[in-house]
Curated annotation (Swiss-Prot):
NCBIfam families reported in the protein's UniProt record: PRK05412.1
Disulfide bonds: none
Single GO cellular component term: cytosol
Protein name (Swiss-Prot/TrEMBL): Nucleotide-binding protein Pcar_0033
Record function comment: Nucleotide-binding protein.
Length: 161
């Protein structure tokens, strides 16, 4: 019985490269001269520090641009609240989302069931397995999910016939 898996994974090496490139740009840009701005990668999060709100927004724009150049979707980033640091500085934690949560998995399964295609979807840990009798139905599910915005970046792997 043909099947495939739906996952949400991020290449941490690409994120590390994008963070390093963004940090280089921030250190060299004229509008950041004389101010303390930084980007740090910590395990499953990125910590952004800006001299003020304007500078923090500019740091975020630089980071998003570098991620886009490295083909990493900004949907994998979960921006936390801005919190004050020392003086006028502002800090923000950005969590890196990996895997499909139970709620998102249920939402994906519901979308697939509402499509009336003859396939079954089941949640397995941090991924969703879709199986059906025809490969054409599975390809229709892939097209359906690519057209929908579920809030996270989806990859389709392990297509078996």
């Amino acid at each position: 019985m043909p099947s495939f898996d739906i996952v949400s994974k991020v290449d941490m090496q690409e994120i590390d490269n994008a963070v390093n490139q963004a940090l280089k740009e921030i250190l060299q840009r004229y509008d950041f001269k004389g101010t303390h701005n930084e980007i740090k990668l910590e395990n499953e999060a990125i910590v952004l520090l800006g001299a003020d709100d304007y500078k923090l927004d500019a740091v975020i724009d630089v980071l998003k641009g570098k991620l886009a150049k490295r083909n990493v979707s900004p949907k994998c980033l979960d921006f936390g609240k801005k919190e004050p640091a020392s003086g006028t500085a502002v800090r923000q934690r950005v969590a890196i989302v990996q895997g499909i949560s139970k709620e998102k998995g249920k939402e994906i399964c519901k979308l697939i069931k509402n499509s009336k295609l003859k396939v079954q979807a089941q949640i397995m840990d941090d991924q969703v397995r879709v199986s059906g009798k025809k490969i054409d139905d599975l390809q229709s599910v892939i097209q359906l999910l690519k057209g929908q915005d579920v809030g996270i970046e989806l990859q389709f792997i392990n297509m078996r016939s």
